[in-house]
Curated annotation (Swiss-Prot):
UDP-N-acetyl-alpha-D-glucosamine binds at R92, D304, I326. It comes from Geobacter metallireducens (strain ATCC 53774 / DSM 7210 / GS-15). GO terms for molecular function: UDP-N-acetylglucosamine 1-carboxyvinyltransferase activity. Belongs to the EPSP synthase family. MurA subfamily. This is UDP-N-acetylglucosamine 1-carboxyvinyltransferase. It catalyses: phosphoenolpyruvate + UDP-N-acetyl-alpha-D-glucosamine = UDP-N-acetyl-3-O-(1-carboxyvinyl)-alpha-D-glucosamine + phosphate. It holds the Pfam family EPSP_synthase. One of its GO terms (biological process) is cell division. The gene is murA.
Length: 417
């Protein structure tokens, strides 16, 4: 098992390029089930979750070949309709194969999902939506079993905005008979990216990126070439890395408009952000100001940046209040940040962070994907040496982050435990 060793206290400088988005790539890969033939996906990040998705697709009959950041997926012979527990248990997004398999073959059997242990993230909204499209849904021995002779369009109003549920039903409705309206749909940029590939396959989807999405079903979809959007959470993590080290970096291949809420809060904290010719320059202050945040669905402050922003607030001037409104149990990084000398108290879904002048390096343990990033950020800012174990979480969502940070001047290396 690997661990990271960080010698902190170095200001980050230089240029870094953002990889393709994990959260966009996973549904994009799965959407190829709907378009039998050879699909080519470009700007693909090297991640454990990508490898898991490839294994799921191969288990269903797809032939997948990778060459650098380009992955070719031939879904001509996707004839198996079962995604087993062994594959699905490690990654929640695997459940997204349910809708495409149902739309293409009229049946699917998919294990209930796994992934990061950050609270109960039920798929009931996925199942409720598929049932509204005419599917017969049953839960049997930890599996979702779904059948439908032909999915039919429907008006579906989500109880809460759900990214996975919106993606699931967009894909299923693409081949349904008639019109489907998704109300209170998720608005994330990754939804737009999925709609983009589906529309180029021949789907008829309008309104992606708004809370109302209209899908007119078509008889068939055709394979395409698609470039995955840049990873906004990776970009945001680098922005905080510059801020927490008082650094000065330039970030390439990112879309700043995807991070408006984060940019606003960073600027409030005293971080200078300049966007010129699609290159974003981030200059950290001597010491950030304490700022309150509340996580919200997009376009609000992203829950996937909460842990990283908390690390920044650990060294801020003053006290900040951080409210987590998306997921329960998403403060698992707090106990590890305390090992650095941070001053954090939790009450319910709210953390109060009193900034300290300096953190001290410590042995810590990653608990989930974004918590891993927060510990790296704390280690970059801390005096002395930090060791982070269980970094396999990190490999689920960050492509070579330690190499990219080293390229910015960080003293960070991966070693075997």
């Amino acid at each position: 098992m690997d661990k990271l060793i960080i010698k902190g206290g170095k200001k980050l400088t230089g240029d870094v390029s953002v990889s393709g988005s994990k959260n966009a790539a996973l549904p994009v890969f799965i959407s190829t089930i709907l378009a039998p033939g050879l699909n080519e996906i470009r700007n693909v990040p090297f991640l454990r979750d990508i490898n898991t998705t490839i294994k799921v697709l191969e288990s269903l009959g797809a032939v997948v070949e990778g060459n650098g950041n380009i992955v070719k997926i031939d879904t001509t012979h996707v004839n198996d309709v079962e995604a087993t527990y062994d594959l699905v248990k490690t990654m929640r997004a695997s459940v997204l194969v349910l809708g495409p398999l149902l739309a293409r073959h009229g049946r699917a059997r998919v294990s209930l999902p796994g992934g990061c242990a950050i609270g109960a993230r039920p798929i009931n909204l996925h199942l409720k939506g598929l049932a509204a499209l005419g599917a017969d849904i049953r839960l049997e021995h930890g599996y979702v079993e779904a059948k439908a002779k032909k999915l039919k369009g429907a008006r579906i109003n989500f109880d809460i905005a759900t990214v996975g549920g919106t993606e699931q039903l967009m894909m299923a409705a693409a081949l349904a008979k008639g019109e489907t309206i998704l109300e209170n749909a998720a608005r994330e940029p990754e939804i737009i990216d999925l709609a983009d590939i589906l529309n180029r396959m021949g789907a008829r989807i309008d309104g992606a990126g708004t809370d109302t999405i209209r899908i007119i079903g078509v008889k068939e979809l055709a394979p395409v070439v698609h470039d995955v959007m840049p990873d906004r959470i990776e970009a945001g993590t680098f922005m905080v890395a510059a801020a927490i080290t008082g650094g000065d970096i330039k970030i390439h291949n990112m879309k700043l408009e995807h991070l408006d809420a984060l940019v606003f809060k960073l600027q409030d904290a005293g971080v200078e952000i300049i966007n010129r010719d699609n290159v974003v320059r981030v200059k950290g202050p001597r010491r950030p100001r304490a700022i309150n945040i509340k996580t919200r669905p997009y376009p609000g402050f992203p829950t996937d940046m909460q842990a990283q922003f908390m690390a920044l607030m650990c060294v801020a001037d003053g006290a900040s209040v951080i409210s987590e409104n998306i997921f329960e149990n998403r403060f698992m990084h707090v106990s590890e940040l305390l090992r650095f000398g941070a001053d954090i108290t939790i009450e319910g879904n709210t953390a109060t962070v009193k900034g300290v002048k300096k953190l001290s390096g410590a042995p810590v343990m990653a608990t989930d994907l974004r918590a891993s990033a927060s510990l790296i950020l704390a280690g970059l800012a801390a005096d002395n040496t930090t060791e982070i174990s269980r970094i396999y979480h990190l490999d689920r969502g960050y492509d070579s982050i330690e190499k990219k940070l080293a390229g910015l001047g960080a003293d960070i290396k991966r070693v075997k435990e």
